[in-house]
């Protein structure tokens, strides 16, 4: 049984990471889906810096970025739960790369799967700064998906 950690931020690259993880996973494997809400978002109910899957009007109604992230991950669980033994969801706040690395240790992940780039401030693509940091500092293998 492998324990796989998949970092998900709603970007196309992270959606491809989920798809690739499923291709690599066996029926007896365990997948943890992780979304990291940058600290600035977790502490603010109104900001211009939005995750791509989070619509501001829904935040005002639901009250929190973390709740919306959990809802999004729960939808993904429904799509993949029949393919593996267990699917966990985690939503953390803080620095995305740091939280991915901490969660990998906490969950005893055998591999980290993430997209090669994600979303940054105001929807602009980062040039893989989170991915780069995870690859350089991870104590387990990292699968970077394009």
Where are these regions (language model features)?
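Short conserved AdoMet
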Residues: 25-27, 81, 139
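Gly/Ser-rich helix-loop-strand patches that form or flank binding pockets
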Residues: 102-146
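Amphipathic, non-transmembrane alpha-helical secondary structure
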Residues: 15-22, 74, 98-101, 105
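Absolute protein N-terminus
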Residues: 1-2, 146
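A short acidic, glycine-rich active-site loop
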Residues: 53-70
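General small-molecule cofactor/ligand-binding pocket signal
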Residues: 32, 88-92, 143
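Small/aliphatic-rich secondary-structure junction motif
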Residues: 2-55
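Structural beta-alpha unit
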Residues: 78-112
